[in-house]
């Protein structure tokens, strides 16, 4: 039990087996020739004759963006171009709250980002990453139009950092960074790494709910200090809710953020053993531009353990939706995400699982990812998925990733089952399958 609702606890364990049993006919219906063909294509691309790339080729890919390196220089000391391209296809097959079956297909330029990073003056680093794509070809005309737009949309990162420890040589700490600009507010485990490094096709909707996203689903402006002492790393920051396509200002809400990372790997029997605590509190009114959809506060506990070919990442978090335009979207929420992973072929083929359970105190206190359930709802007026909103959500994910050149060139494939309810009534249940080609340097 995670939260109480109307003085009644919602039991998770009894729900899971019955949900899976009831979903089997829908799953069998889902396995059409078309979806099987998607999987066959994905596996064909991973055949050794096609997929094998030698270490020299992969090393060239990883270093492709490096174009300047002069560590002894007094001005610019190094610089690197960044590019990330991801193309994604998906298929959904499910039932709405009235039991009406539907299915839909999607194809998109998932991400196309370019950027520049480097260091100068011995103590300074800079980073800027521009989102250059806005692919809405899957959206209906009545929801803002169906189009593919190219050019600068927003910055995913744009910041300047100062190596304070190297400059002042603090005796009691190992490192200290001071920074200003646009950056990520890390909460759930899935947001501890870049989109180029995530293990699933999409981050879970619960991790996205905790994320400090701005009104254009980007990373906000912040000022921060981060330092490391022994096994402990601390991060304190103030984030601004004010949005701008470029840098922005400080005229709207403010979010106060703090986190602690404890790395116990050296003293543990596991190769990987980490704990992460993070918290934020937002101050702002309903009329302000706000982060994280207006969340008032959130607290997250992350544990990561791993040994040899396996790893288990866990996120447990709670929060409050803050003031919303509709009362049934306010109130407390909480959830848990378990992500086991196993290397079937070392550094080549990884099996990824994920279980998600989340619930909220109000009937529409949760919302699923736009890919692809709410999107399917907007495309088909004959079904009603309540725009992907509800108060209780289960999701089971199973993925298989093939790494041509480590994280720099890979194929990510995943199958997910979702069950969404609101006030005890079913809103959606069904399966989503997808595949994504991802390359970056």
What are these regions (language model features)?
Residues 1-58:
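Cleavable N-terminal export/targeting peptides
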Residues 2, 36-38, 43-50, 223, ...:
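Intrinsic disorder/low-complexity segments
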Residues 5, 206, 435-437:
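In a subset of proteins, long, contiguous C-terminal domains/tails are tracked
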Residues 17, 46, 50, 134, ...:
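Hydrophobic alpha-helical membrane context
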Residues 42-44, 179, 335, 414:
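Small side chains
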Residues 53-58, 88-104, 127, 143-151, ...:
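Outer-membrane beta-barrel pore domains
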Residues 54-69:
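Short N-terminal segments immediately surrounding and downstream of signal-peptide cleavage
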Residues 68-93, 101-244, 250-269, 336-363:
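Outer membrane beta-barrel
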